[in-house]
Amino acid sequence: MVIFEKTRGKNSPSVMPSKKGDVSNIPTDMLRTKKPILPEQAELDVVRHYTQLSRKNFCIDTNFYPLGSCTMKYNPRAAHKYASLAGFLERHPYASAQSIQGTLECLYDLQNLIKELTGMTGVSLAPMAGAQGEFAGVAMIKAYHHKRGDFERDEIIVPDAAHGTNPATAKVCGLKVIEIPTKKDGDIDIEALDKVLGPKTAGIMLTNPSTVGVFERNIAVIAKKVHEAGGLLYYDGANLNAIMGKARPGDMGFDVLHMNLHKTFATPHGGGGPGAGPVAVNDKLKEFLPVPMVGKKDDKFVWLEEKDVPNTIGRLSAFNGNIGVLIRAYIYGAMLGGNGLTEASEIATLNANYMMARLKEEGFTIAYPDRRASHEFIVTLKPEFLNYGVTATDFAKCLIDRGVHAPTMYFPLLVPECLLIEPTETENVDSMEKFIQAMVEIRDIAKKDPQYLKGAPYNLPARRLDDVKAAKELDIVWQPK
């Protein structure tokens, strides 16, 4: 029930009357002719309504959240605490650089940390989400070729095991997407790559480790071939949590990347807060970085704008990035340090391999059984589908009934009936075992009563939804009857 439907007459709290403003300068077609439709509820009723809704929310603070390729790790409260200090929290976007030297120093240090972690030489913190970071990265590749007069390079190569947003990003930037396959062992098909490389190649977008959860072993060969063809390498940082302190994209031959701070650096996801997708580049692309960036002149920290970076692809927002998120990421990096970040990747990888081994031990089918998992892995439920008629969706709905958020389903598309599972480093053995036992229990039920799975979930406020109707008859705005 939405709060509007709870209105029962005049229950709204009293509001002190205010002086009416002058509306003479407002066009008449923009003036309201009817009273706004607002819920009439007492303050206590409003508090209760939203508190009850929050209890129905599924979040990392209350449950295991093994959503593959999303890195749903715990967000340390210390980062929230210090990012909420008055000097950070009350900073106005238009405040002068001179008055926010502490904030700028933190951002400057974060830029340097990202350079060191990724092996790149230039960083912009301007992108306000991972997708915007992707856009900035591909836009820089396009700007690089156009500055060289290479206008015919309009193709981006995207493996079928790349992160799902990559093709969309290339399209938004006005480039053509050329898909290449992944081999049965999880590596890119080099022969297929050779066939599509040429004078129209602008670059290739890769996630490494890939979305199938394995490290691309031929990355050095791929980098050499793409560069020899005149293209650039884009690194999607979706899976960077697997290799912090172990390998650097810049050392692999990548020219540009974006990081998802809401994944790798434990800042809040989605409804928990805005994102941040910094971009990092090598010397080839530094002149194209989006502004603003933080620089240092005469021992003072300054904003670098268009006049300082004349070939920049420009601004991505009105202000200077999601600084509240960036400060949280800075604090996370400062708390862990280089050794701590490396250990985080080690434990994330250990947890993924533990879960993969245990599920294999319990008889589940691993998509790439001969490869070590990076920070995530894939279980294919194709045998369960063929034997009992149950799907990955059925398993997912039953997992939610058992207090575990479902892993990513049906992605990557090249593995049938798949669950992409990523435990992250912040989970312990008990929570992972709870998930494993839930999977075993659900499969046991499927053997005896597959229809039971078709009706799940049973213990949630909303039962199984009609996905087809939801897609065809989208209704996301409440209107009075």
Curated annotation (Swiss-Prot):
Keyword Oxidoreductase in the entry? The reply is yes
Look up keyword Oxidoreductase and say if it applies: yes
Q: Identify which top EC class this enzyme belongs to.
A: oxidoreductase
What GO cellular-component annotations does this UniProt entry give?
Answer: cytosol; glycine cleavage complex
Q: Which GO terms describe its molecular function?
A: glycine binding; glycine dehydrogenase (decarboxylating) activity; pyridoxal phosphate binding
| Residue list for modification N6-(pyridoxal phosphate)lysine | 263
Question: What cofactor requirement does the entry state?
Answer: pyridoxal 5'-phosphate
Q: Per the record, which residues fall in region Disordered?
A: 1-26
Q: What InterPro entries does this protein map onto?
A: GcvPB, GDC-P_C, GDC-P_N, GDC_P, PyrdxlP-dep_Trfase, PyrdxlP-dep_Trfase_major, PyrdxlP-dep_Trfase_small
Q: What is its EC number?
A: 1.4.4.2
Catalytic function, reaction form: N(6)-[(R)-lipoyl]-L-lysyl-[glycine-cleavage complex H protein] + glycine + H(+) = N(6)-[(R)-S(8)-aminomethyldihydrolipoyl]-L-lysyl-[glycine-cleavage complex H protein] + CO2
Q: Which UniProt keywords apply?
A: Oxidoreductase, Pyridoxal phosphate
User: A biological process (GO) annotation for this entry?
Assistant: glycine decarboxylation via glycine cleavage system
Which Pfam families does this one have?
GcvP2_C, GDC-P
Q: Tell me the HAMAP family matching this sequence.
A: GcvPB
Subunit: The glycine cleavage system is composed of four proteins: P, T, L and H. In this organism, the P 'protein' is a heterodimer of two subunits.
Give the family, as the similarity comment puts it.
Belongs to the GcvP family. C-terminal subunit subfamily.
**Briefly, what is this protein's role?**
The glycine cleavage system catalyzes the degradation of glycine. The P protein binds the alpha-amino group of glycine through its pyridoxal phosphate cofactor; CO(2) is released and the remaining methylamine moiety is then transferred to the lipoamide cofactor of the H protein.
Its protein name is Probable glycine dehydrogenase (decarboxylating) subunit 2
| Species name | Francisella tularensis subsp. novicida (strain U112)
Its ancestry begins with: Bacteria, Pseudomonadati, Pseudomonadota, Gammaproteobacteria, Thiotrichales
